[in-house]
């Protein structure tokens, strides 16, 4: 009986740990920058892409496998909220592989579409994403 309980506990632990990693695939992206007058530009048109994204909450790391791999270490979970369009968002602070700080948001619209926003002080980009696993 003890062995059965131990096996069940190990299986449950593995399931819980595994559930903390989410896999996405970005299908398009857009960006905007701060112009020379200090104002944000409009978002660019969407550009197609095929970029895997892994959100590993066990290790507090988000990795975006674009042409240049982007690694974001989550430093603080800010909040989870419903935005004015009815979508739900999770927002957190991060430090990237170049030690720059920013804010990342995972947004899930009411219709199920999802985006990942990466915001710095002078540039921000957004990926349209789908869960891949």
Model-derived features with residue positions:
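Contiguous, well-ordered beta-strand patches that form the walls/edges
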Residues: 61-103
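Tryptophan-anchored aromatic micro-motifs
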Residues: 20-44
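Edge beta-strand at a domain terminus
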Residues: 68-81, 119-133
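N-terminal glycine/threonine-rich, aromatic-flanked beta-hairpin/loop signature
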Residues: 44-74, 115-119
């Amino acid at each position: 009986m003890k062995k059965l309980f131990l096996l069940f506990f190990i299986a449950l632990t593995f399931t819980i740990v595994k559930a903390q990693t989410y896999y996405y695939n970005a299908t398009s992206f857009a960006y905007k920058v701060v112009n020379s007058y200090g104002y944000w530009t409009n978002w660019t048109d969407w550009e197609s892409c095929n970029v895997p994204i892994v959100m590993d909450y066990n290790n507090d790391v988000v990795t975006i496998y674009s042409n240049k791999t982007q690694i974001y270490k989550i430093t603080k979970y800010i909040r989870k909220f419903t935005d004015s369009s009815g979508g739900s968002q999770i927002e957190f602070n991060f430090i990237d592989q170049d030690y720059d700080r920013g804010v990342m948001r995972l947004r899930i619209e009411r219709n199920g579409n999802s985006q990942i926003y990466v915001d710095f002080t002078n540039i921000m980009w957004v990926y349209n994403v789908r869960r891949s696993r």
